[in-house]
């Protein structure tokens, strides 16, 4: 029996639903997987499960002011589906785009919302996964089986954002909140706001709140590189004025953004001092003449060792220039009744404190995995090309790029998984298992010399690992994987079929 075949099963008095492919997650990766399954395998059964009440994943959960993309949408959009909006888009615009994909690919009936995957167990005898699911809407436990499991749930612990232990936090009399759990009724009009953090979320929240707040202070322990980018690309305007197919416009813009991005990442790796100077020079015209750019926007790490925060039309810089927002680089001594006292002795008054201090990573949604009764410890497993796990049969996962747009890798992975499923059918194989030899050395999923933001470094001990050689490595670079993944040899001995 190949992974495309089904057979009825029962448990107790009820039937257990079986699908050929079970996709976990109805965000960008999961909906993209659904498109590829629908397009490449019209006769194959599949379902998409998601914990939340609606589609979108991160874009559904992020409700904080100004929530938007931190990548351009011409590369964040799917390869098959032209993006027709601005280069940088709001969460609402992205959700509308996903709705179009769901409708065009007839995915609505395949998505099961409020289905939280709790555990999954593989049986080699049956060549299938048994998946335990908790219905969030009814609190009942249900079971499904599948021939192939495709984990597209992302890597954020949405219900457990990262917030450090701040001394004296209980003393502050106003609200303290994390962007991940933003209250819908919060009113910051005319209020003094302190946003703790310096990453993409802080760079989004600060200008959005500054529109109506009395003043917003971004308090950071260390700086982040930031860059202003046009919300609407001039080339997009020019191309859309021409009488050419939208698909051409999309592909031209997509390639343009990819090559521009590749050039900056190349410069950052090969000539980091030149890349640093370029970024600082790009920021200066947007900021007040007396602004201390070296102190506030010149981090110690080299460019792209952590993500560069993208500012649509330089919105946060504009808030600073207009006096609506400011940046303070210091460490917190303690919260007080009326704000925050810093190590320098300065006190920041606040009515509201926002802790934009990052996220915790989740390894496969913290789902319990077993293979033939043995628990899987992912922290002791290497990945096959950053897509499958050593010793875990018939399971693929999507982990996008740290620097490039997430969806670029999601599309490449969908291509490879589709090719693998077809290859299994051609071989008459029921299962495929990545199998690394005992001499493959375990290395961190992300090399700190390459990419080392706090949310990644905090999670290295519980994340899956890279090996010391191909195909047990993860390149993290689209410029390389756009060639290596389509050319991956599925019969090089690293995958065992049965």
Each predicted region: which residue ranges?
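Short FAD-binding loop at a beta-strand-to-alpha-helix junction that anchors the flavin cofactor
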Residues: 77, 175-176, 386-403
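Rossmann-like dinucleotide-binding core of oxidoreductases
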Residues: 13-18, 22-23, 28, 32-33, ...
């Amino acid at each position: 029996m190949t992974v495309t075949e089904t057979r009825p099963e029962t448990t107790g008095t009820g039937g257990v639903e079986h699908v050929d492919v079970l996709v976990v997650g109805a965000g960008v990766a999961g909906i993209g997987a659904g498109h590829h399954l629908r397009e490449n395998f019209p006769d194959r059964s599949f379902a998409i499960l998601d914990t939340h009440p609606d589609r979108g994943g991160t874009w559904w959960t992020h409700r904080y002011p100004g929530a938007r993309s931190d990548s351009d949408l011409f590369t964040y959009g799917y390869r098959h589906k032209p993006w027709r909006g601005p280069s940088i888009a709001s969460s609402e615009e992205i959700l509308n785009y996903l709705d179009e994909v769901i409708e065009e690919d007839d995915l609505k009936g395949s998505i099961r919302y409020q289905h939280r995957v709790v555990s999954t167990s593989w049986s080699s005898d049956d060549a299938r996964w048994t998946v335990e699911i908790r219905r969030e809407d009814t609190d009942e436990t249900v079971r499904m089986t599948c021939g192939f499991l495709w984990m597209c749930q992302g890597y954020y612990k949405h219900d457990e954002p990262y917030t450090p232990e701040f001394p004296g936090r209980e003393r502050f009399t106003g609200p303290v909140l994390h962007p991940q759990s933003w209250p819908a009724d919060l009113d910051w009009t005319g209020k003094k706001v302190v946003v703790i953090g310096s990453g993409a979320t802080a760079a989004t929240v600060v200008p959005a709140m500054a529109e109506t707040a009395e003043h917003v202070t971004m308090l950071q322990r260390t700086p982040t590189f930031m860059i202003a980018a046009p919300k609407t690309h001039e080339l997009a305007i020019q191309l859309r004025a021409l009488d050419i197919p939208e698909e051409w416009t999309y592909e031209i813009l997509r390639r343009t953004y990819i090559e521009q991005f590749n050039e900056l990442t190349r410069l950052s790796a090969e000539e980091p001092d030149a890349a640093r100077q370029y970024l600082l020079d790009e920021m200066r015209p947007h900021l007040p003449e007396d602004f201390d750019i070296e102190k506030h926007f010149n981090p110690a790490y080299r460019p792209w060792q952590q993500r560069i925060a993208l500012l649509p039309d330089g919105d946060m810089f504009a808030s600073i220039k207009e006096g609506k927002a400011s940046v303070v680089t210091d460490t917190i001594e303690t919260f007080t009744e009326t704000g925050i006292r810093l190590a320098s002795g300065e006190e920041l008054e606040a009515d509201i404190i926002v802790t934009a201090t990052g996220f915790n990573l989740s390894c496969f949604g913290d789902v319990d995995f077993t293979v033939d009764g043995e628990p899987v410890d992912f922290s002791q497993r290497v990945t096959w090309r950053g897509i499958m796990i050593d010793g875990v049969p018939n399971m693929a996962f999507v982990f996008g790029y740290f620097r490039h747009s997430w969806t670029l890798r999601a599309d490449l992975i969908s291509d490879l998984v589709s090719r693998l499923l077809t290859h299994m059918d051609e071989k008459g194989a029921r299962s495929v298992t990545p199998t690394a030899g005992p001499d493959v050395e375990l290395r961190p999923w992300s090399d700190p010399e390459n990419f080392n933001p706090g949310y990644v470094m905090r999670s290295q001990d519980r994340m899956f690992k890279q090996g010391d050689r191909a195909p047990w490595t993860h390149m993290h670079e689209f410029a390389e994987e756009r060639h290596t993944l389509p050319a991956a040899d599925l019969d090089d001995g690293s995958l065992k079929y049965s």
